[in-house]
Amino acid sequence: MTTGLHEFNLASRRAEEAAARRFQAVQWLKSVVGQLGIPNQPSEKEFISCLRNGMILCNAINKIHPGAVSKVVENYSYLNGEYQLPPAYQYFENVRNFLVALETLRLPGFEASDLEKDNLESGSVTKVVDCILGLKAYHECKLPSNGNGLYKHVKTPTFQLSATKIHPTLSASKTSRHLDMSSVRERNDCTDGESDKLKGIAKLFADHIFSSKENIDENLVSLENGSENSRANFEKILSRFPELQSVFKNLLSEGTLKPSDLKSMPLEELPVHEEDQSSRSLSHKTKCNHKRLLKTQEKELAVLKNLFIKTKQDFKEFQVYLQRDLMELGNQMQEMSSAAQGYYKVVEENRKLYNMVQDLKGNIRVYCRVRPIFNSEMDGVIDYIGKDGSLFVLDPSKPYKDARKTFQFNQVFGPTATQDDVFRETQPLIRSVMDGYNVCIFAYGQTGSGKTYTMSGPPGRSATEMGINYLALSDLFLICDRRKDMMTYEIYVQMVEIYNEQVRDLLAENSSYIRTCSSDDDGLSLPDATMHSVNSTKDVLQLMEAGEVNRAVSSTSMNNRSSRSHSIFMVHVRGKDTSGGTLRSCLHLVDLAGSERVDKSEVTGDRLKEAQYINKSLSCLGDVISALAQKNSHIPYRNSKLTLLLQDSLGGQAKTLMFAHLSPEEDSFGETISTLKFAQRVSTVELGAARAHKETREVMHLKEQIENLKRALGTEEWNNVSNGSKEIKSPFSRPIATTERTPPRLRRLSIENCSSTKANLEDRRGIKSPLASRRAQILSLEGPMSCKNEENGKGDPTMEVHQLKNPRSPLSSYQNRAVKVDGRTSIPQLQLLQTPVKGASRNDIQMISVDSKTNGKGSHIRKSLRTIGKLINGSEKRKENIPADPRSPLGVANNFSHIKSPDTSNAKTMRRQSLTGVMPPGQERSRRSSIGGKPIENGKKDHVFTPFRLNKFNN
């Protein structure tokens, strides 16, 4: 324990003494040269790094002895604070010149290798410090004597020892006799064995000195200052150790040094003349070492130079190769880029062609979306999702080779798909709404599979989590802004839900129920629902939030926020272009309630009732899809309110898309397979090509003409009814009741006559009902148009009504009165079958002549004429159910044999007139009368054909 503490104290004192000597050397160099750029108490590495380039040493020796170093290389500044390895020539030249100057001044030096940073051996730093302190002593000795003073450098006795070195500085004159261990070491430097012995002596001497516990520091300081005689003090120290005297005496007498035989010897017997000899030998050896080191460094420098030249050439070759490879790589990248562009172009064209084929076939597009697994520890049933729309699922109850099931859809979105990815695929379909097409997108799947997330987004959604409802409206507003120079759009929205088979308005203040589900001509499936106009996405977001608040939502064991109703978000678009054409379309965004199993959802009470209604409506939807897939003649749309509202979308003339949502957990495998099979069945449904709801300006003009025609016909027939009812009161003008036994001859009439006239026989009691206007409308459209009237009808078309009025006297004749009615309408040239009409008057025979000019396209008016044809067929059916009036002289030809002519006074009068040959003017009579009188001819213009007989009148 005592020995270890002694060694620690000894090492500490030695380190302090070495630091003190370095401090003295640095302070002296700063006073001579200037700032060195190192701390006042530097470490050994910092001290050596500062002196490595030799500039400081050369400048210091030139200060002491001007001209000692003739050339100093000064291209490296030691004041910059960066101690980097200087160039080799500067290192060797400055250090070599400094060592040569030291040799000239006969001052102790050191080896150039002592300045190597990586070669700090024991005692190397001590040599450099001793050299600088020697320069200091030489400088101080030279100043008082004006350059002629005596100088004696005293080195540290243990400068060769790293672990036991001490650094006292001793100053004395050269003539003084003292123990100089450096002289002994230099004298015996020629033999390595003696050097080892000297080291042992010095170590033993140092141990004895420090073990004496004397205050040597004060003595050393006094010796350094020159206040005391160093020789006397040293002799005093040695006198206390008689064994050292015997050791030195034996050493000098025998010529050999052994640590075990050390004896004391007097200091006077130490040789002094050998000091110069050892110094010269050391200087010669140092010079030889410097030359050898310089040659070695020159050889290494030449090798490095050759290596640098070779490396430079290799670098140039490598640069050429690199440029060539870069050019080849650029060409390959360009080819790959061109190929990739061509590939994507072909893919886009194929996609457009595929969508075109789908539009022509009218198939329902089916997209499948798989939500992420909520519990990461559970295994999923989704095995593979392909980019081509393929989907592989695994049945957990079967082995792997038999468990895989394959499905194919238009597109499949994996768990990592975002809302924007889903909307990007549906965007072309949604944008077709702005072109006049009806579009329906509905989400189908098990409860908790993510339907509401896809359509509306999660509660408290961010901008990146918005559903298709919001993104679709935002895209429609963007298109409206782009087309504002060509089209003017108006967008309206409705939001309803089907809750327990009742339609409820979600945007109404009281969320009232809508009892009727009808479809009007304006394209509204629910005209009673509240409709709101929207102009920005902000309006849409507010309405969506209001509707979601009113929607029926509840919590079950399968889903914390389960939708208990079918939500339908309807977007109505009305557009008008600059030419006056219009379009209308509707976008249905349907969020179906999820199918659920009651045993898994664990619902009771009202929730159970809701689940039953939900499953029933989804079952009806499945029945409709199956009927459409099998192309049945009857589609059960009316089995559910859901299918009734989706009738326009599923029944054709619309573009339809279904999202099939899947839950990937194993416990939901049954519902997943059911959803996939339903989606696969939906994908086989062909609805036919969708039809755009556009109307050009010409079509609108033709429809307006049809409406004007209908109004004109109604006004004209009402006038005819009014005039006919006023002229039935004369008792003298009742026509003869005759029978017609042959059916009408339409073909013969069309050949013989060029005019289109009709006979409207009214009831003898007069017309008492406005239904005659419809009969007149029917009769006005029966028969061909008159060629003569078509030639003469260049002015305004008119209708002429000829009536036979009662004469004021028996001898007066009937006069024809023509009532012209403005009917600027176009009557098509159609020949319809003649229908027998009841209700002809016994007093008057009404003749109607229609003269109008036909213009416009018949194809655009055909729809209106079909409507009129339905009225005709309807009137025929009604007439078949009404029994014939026995008082009417008119009837069907086949029933004439069962009808007897009334024996009235008027008939007798007519018979007498026929016998006498006197007939009232204008009185019509049949050629097939029972008397056989000659009928009156009217060759002027009126040839009237009735469904029962052909009469000719003469004026």
Swiss-Prot record:
It comes from the Eukaryota. GO terms for cellular component: microtubule; microtubule cytoskeleton. Pfam families: CH, Kinesin. One of its GO terms (molecular function) is microtubule motor activity. ATP binds at residues 445-452. Residues 692-719 form a coiled coil. The keyword Coiled coil applies. GO terms for biological process: microtubule-based movement; microtubule-based process. Residues 19-140 form the Calponin-homology (CH) domain. Transmembrane segments: none annotated. Signal peptide: none annotated. Residues 894-916 have a biased composition (Polar residues). Disulfide bonds: none annotated. Residues 363-685 form the Kinesin motor domain. Belongs to the TRAFAC class myosin-kinesin ATPase superfamily. Kinesin family. KIN-14 subfamily. This is Kinesin-like protein KIN-14L. The lineage of its organism: Eukaryota, Viridiplantae, Streptophyta, Embryophyta, Tracheophyta.
